Amino acid sequence: GGPSQKQKQHKVNLVNIKVYI
């Protein structure tokens, strides 16, 4: 995906890690 806001990037990071594993 593409984090538009930096604040949302934090939430996307957690989800990305889960999908990455």
UniProtKB/Swiss-Prot annotation:
Endpoints of the signal sequence: none
Keywords: Copper, Oxygen transport, Secreted, Transport
Subcellular location: Secreted, Extracellular space
Keyword Transport: yes
GO MF: oxygen carrier activity
A Gene Ontology term for the protein's cellular component: extracellular region
Major localization class: secreted
Tissues in which the UniProt entry reports expression: Hemolymph.
Family to which this protein belongs: Belongs to the tyrosinase family. Hemocyanin subfamily.
Function text: Hemocyanins are copper-containing oxygen carriers occurring freely dissolved in the hemolymph of many mollusks and arthropods.
Name the record gives this protein: Hemocyanin subunit 6
